[in-house]
């Protein structure tokens, strides 16, 4: 193979000019045309018997284009291997204006290479390690949430109070005129839950079924409905029904409803503590991991390949559209989401992927089989039949990619925590559970 010069363009972009001998192009084109001749069905000739000259007239140009494309791809691969180029993404090929060599056809390949990743001094980085505990108070709090999730509403003949569910008819007017979305019949909501504007809810409190009254409501300037934002409306409200909230007792029936077959309340609390502890651990680990990843990004000066960032942005856009479809938005598949809104996240992901790959390779942080098994077991623990979930993961090797990635990340986090300046941060239960999962 002739020597090829790799030209450095901007940042990670490189350029090589590939030279394809016309003798090779013509030989490959002739071979392709003969293959076409054997398959061709042309009027006036038996199948495969049309003259090669006619086949060349009909298919010669497209055959030559196919051959050039194949040779370009093959030649670029050979050059990349010979020059030990770590190509990121796919190259683009452009014609070369100066075709000064009549013996060959020249094509320019423009591509990006992976950046050299140099891990900086991790001991200079600060990392926040988050901690939290789950005790009786947190179990009590969770049980109370579970009770509220199973609230029953029973009809009562009294004035409406906060926490009651009410059913109302209402009609609103601004300057004496009805407005879009300002009226409804048999509308149900829970007082004090913040479903309606505070002035509206306050007007309903104290009413009895069958009563009607006018309530003045001032829409905030930042109200989501632009047509009414900042305006004052008068609502005529009729209360149809009042229902009082009743929470279930924490007894055997309640425990059974939560999956404790024998209704043992103590077992139920143990199960709640185990589940909540697992979720708290997951969340604090996520926050610690986020801090570690931020430290790695600070420790490494890195320019992510544009091609990989664009690919990741497109993947994130498709992922969002699929999530919309899964939520019932059938038309979301056709959404034209601008990739720019995903670029920052995509660049972060690509950069971290390159940094982690280097860190894992340099420090032998690949997970053991036992570590991957532990991640899978942790996934399965919250399901009714954990073994069924474990068997599902191991039935198809590709399914182990996610738990393997998590095991790698866990090893990276432990490694960085052992090198960096670690500041422990204890969070309350509410702070942890209020954090984004």
UniProtKB/Swiss-Prot annotation:
<comment type="function">
    <text>Involved in protein export. Acts as a chaperone by maintaining the newly synthesized protein in an open conformation. Functions as a peptidyl-prolyl cis-trans isomerase.</text>
</comment>
<dbReference type="GO" id="GO:0005737">
    <property type="term" value="C:cytoplasm"/>
</dbReference>
<dbReference type="GO" id="GO:0044183">
    <property type="term" value="F:protein folding chaperone"/>
</dbReference>
<dbReference type="GO" id="GO:0003755">
    <property type="term" value="F:peptidyl-prolyl cis-trans isomerase activity"/>
</dbReference>
<dbReference type="InterPro" id="IPR027304">
    <property type="entry name" value="Trigger_fact/SurA_dom_sf"/>
</dbReference>
<keyword id="KW-0413">Isomerase</keyword>
<dbReference type="InterPro" id="IPR008881">
    <property type="entry name" value="Trigger_fac_ribosome-bd_bac"/>
</dbReference>
<dbReference type="GO" id="GO:0051301">
    <property type="term" value="P:cell division"/>
</dbReference>
<dbReference type="InterPro" id="IPR036611">
    <property type="entry name" value="Trigger_fac_ribosome-bd_sf"/>
</dbReference>
<dbReference type="InterPro" id="IPR037041">
    <property type="entry name" value="Trigger_fac_C_sf"/>
</dbReference>
<comment type="similarity">
    <text>Belongs to the FKBP-type PPIase family. Tig subfamily.</text>
</comment>
<keyword id="KW-0697">Rotamase</keyword>
<keyword id="KW-0132">Cell division</keyword>
<dbReference type="InterPro" id="IPR005215">
    <property type="entry name" value="Trig_fac"/>
</dbReference>
<dbReference type="Pfam" id="PF00254">
    <property type="entry name" value="FKBP_C"/>
</dbReference>
<dbReference type="GO" id="GO:0043335">
    <property type="term" value="P:protein unfolding"/>
</dbReference>
<keyword id="KW-0143">Chaperone</keyword>
<dbReference type="GO" id="GO:0043022">
    <property type="term" value="F:ribosome binding"/>
</dbReference>
<dbReference type="Pfam" id="PF05698">
    <property type="entry name" value="Trigger_C"/>
</dbReference>
<keyword id="KW-0963">Cytoplasm</keyword>
<keyword id="KW-0131">Cell cycle</keyword>
<dbReference type="InterPro" id="IPR046357">
    <property type="entry name" value="PPIase_dom_sf"/>
</dbReference>
<feature type="domain" description="PPIase FKBP-type">
    <location>
        <begin position="163"/>
        <end position="248"/>
    </location>
</feature>
<dbReference type="GO" id="GO:0015031">
    <property type="term" value="P:protein transport"/>
</dbReference>
<dbReference type="InterPro" id="IPR001179">
    <property type="entry name" value="PPIase_FKBP_dom"/>
</dbReference>
<protein>
    <recommendedName>
        <fullName>Trigger factor</fullName>
        <ecNumber>5.2.1.8</ecNumber>
    </recommendedName>
</protein>
<dbReference type="GO" id="GO:0051083">
    <property type="term" value="P:'de novo' cotranslational protein folding"/>
</dbReference>
<dbReference type="Pfam" id="PF05697">
    <property type="entry name" value="Trigger_N"/>
</dbReference>
<dbReference type="GO" id="GO:0061077">
    <property type="term" value="P:chaperone-mediated protein folding"/>
</dbReference>
<dbReference type="InterPro" id="IPR008880">
    <property type="entry name" value="Trigger_fac_C"/>
</dbReference>
């Amino acid at each position: 193979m002739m020597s090829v010069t790799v030209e450095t363009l901007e940042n990670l972009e490189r350029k090589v000019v590939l030279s394809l001998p016309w003798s090779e192009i013509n030989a490959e084109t002739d071979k392709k045309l003969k293959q076409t001749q054997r398959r061709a069905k042309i009027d006036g000739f038996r199948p495969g018997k049309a003259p090669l000259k006619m086949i060349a007239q009909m298919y010669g140009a497209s055959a030559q284009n196919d051959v050039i494309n194949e040779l370009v791809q093959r030649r670029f691969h050979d050059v990349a291997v010979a020059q030990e180029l770590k190509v990121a993404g796919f190259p683009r090929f452009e014609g070369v204006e100066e075709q000064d060599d009549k013996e060959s056809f020249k094509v320019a390949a423009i591509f990006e290479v992976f950046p050299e990743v140099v891990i900086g001094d991790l001991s200079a980085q600060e990392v926040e390690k988050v901690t939290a505990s789950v005790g009786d108070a947190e179990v009590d709090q969770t049980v109370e949430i579970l009770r509220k999730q199973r609230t029953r509403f029973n009809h009562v003949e009294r004035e409406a109070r906060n926490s009651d569910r009410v059913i109302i008819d209402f009609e609103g007017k601004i300057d004496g005129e009805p407005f879009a979305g300002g009226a409804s019949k048999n509308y149900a909501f829970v007082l004090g839950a913040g479903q309606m504007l505070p002035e509206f809810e306050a007007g309903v409190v104290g009413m009895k079924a069958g009563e009607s009254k006018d309530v003045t409501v001032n829409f905030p300037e930042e109200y989501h409905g632009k047509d009414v934002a900042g305006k004052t409306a008068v609502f005529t409200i009729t209360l149809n029904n009042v229902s009082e909230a009743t929470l279930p007792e924490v007894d055997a029936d309640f425990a059974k409803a939560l999956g404790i077959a024998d209704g043992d309340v103590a077992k139920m609390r143990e199960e709640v503590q185990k589940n909540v502890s697992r979720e708290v651990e997951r969340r604090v680990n996520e926050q610690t991991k986020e801090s570690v990843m931020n430290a790695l990004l600070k420790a490494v000066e890195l320019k992510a390949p544009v091609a990989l960032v664009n690919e990741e942005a497109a993947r994130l856009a498709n992922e969002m559209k699929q999530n919309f479809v899964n939520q019932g938005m059938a038309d979301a598949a056709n959404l034209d989401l601008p990739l720019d809104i995903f670029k920052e996240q995509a660049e972060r992901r690509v950069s971290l992927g390159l940094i982690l790959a280097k860190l894992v390779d340099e420090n032998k942080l690949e997970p053991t089989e036992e570590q991957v098994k532990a991640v899978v077991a942790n996934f399965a623990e919250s399901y009714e039949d954990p073994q069924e979930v474990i068997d599902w993961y191991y039935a198809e090797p590709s399914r182990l990619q996610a738990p393997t990635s998590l095991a790698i990340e866990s090893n990276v986090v432990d490694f960085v925590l052992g090198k960096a300046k670690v500041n422990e941060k204890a969070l309350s239960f509410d702070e942890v559970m209020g954090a984004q999962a």
